[in-house]
């Protein structure tokens, strides 16, 4: 039975960049655990702020954190109060100077993490899993996606035996490395246990820049 490789991990270094941009030798393990603590803390504090990607860059005793969010106003707060409080908490957590950069996501319906999160929240509110998936697919295709695939797994409708059910529209070429495919998985806590939600979104091809081989001509 064929297994699927992680679509983002497969494309890192080809058309995707790393979410953590730093180099270390002896401190590698410490930095890695610090990164995990930063991500976990931000995801907990900003659970309702539609934060998708968290990028971390490091310099000497300085950490730059870029938050990609569909709700920048909620992250910043009135007069910057929320982001200042978050910065102070991260400074205390890491013992380093943390700089926070906020990047607005212009099209949240083309972000797999946000689409998956939306489906998961609907499932927690007892929306039918088929309806939640089909509505998400329609919104994503209207937003300009070339294709989308969703899958919900677990005790669907409270069934005794867990199963998976998914829907797709358009094309999702997982083997094409130049294909810009966003992938995410989320969990929904329901009265019957956890449901897993997976989302693949194909946003078009990213062609590498053409190299000039004729000496500047």
Swiss-Prot record:
SUPFAM superfamilies: Prokaryotic type KH domain (KH-domain type II) (SSF54814), Ribosomal protein S3 C-terminal domain (SSF54821)
GO cellular component: cytosolic small ribosomal subunit
Any one GO BP annotation for this protein: translation
A Pfam family per the record: KH_2
GO molecular function annotations of the record: mRNA binding; rRNA binding; structural constituent of ribosome
UniProtKB keywords: Ribonucleoprotein, Ribosomal protein, RNA-binding, rRNA-binding
Gene3D superfamilies, alphabetized: 3.30.300.20, Ribosomal protein S3, C-terminal domain
Coiled coil start-end: none
Segments forming domain KH type-2: 29-97
UniProt cross-references to PANTHER family, sorted A to Z: 30S/40S RIBOSOMAL PROTEIN S3, SMALL RIBOSOMAL SUBUNIT PROTEIN US3C
Task performed by this protein: Binds the lower part of the 30S subunit head. Binds mRNA in the 70S ribosome, positioning it for translation.
Sequence similarity: Belongs to the universal ribosomal protein uS3 family.
Subunit structure: Part of the 30S ribosomal subunit. Forms a tight complex with proteins S10 and S14.
Record protein name field: Small ribosomal subunit protein uS3
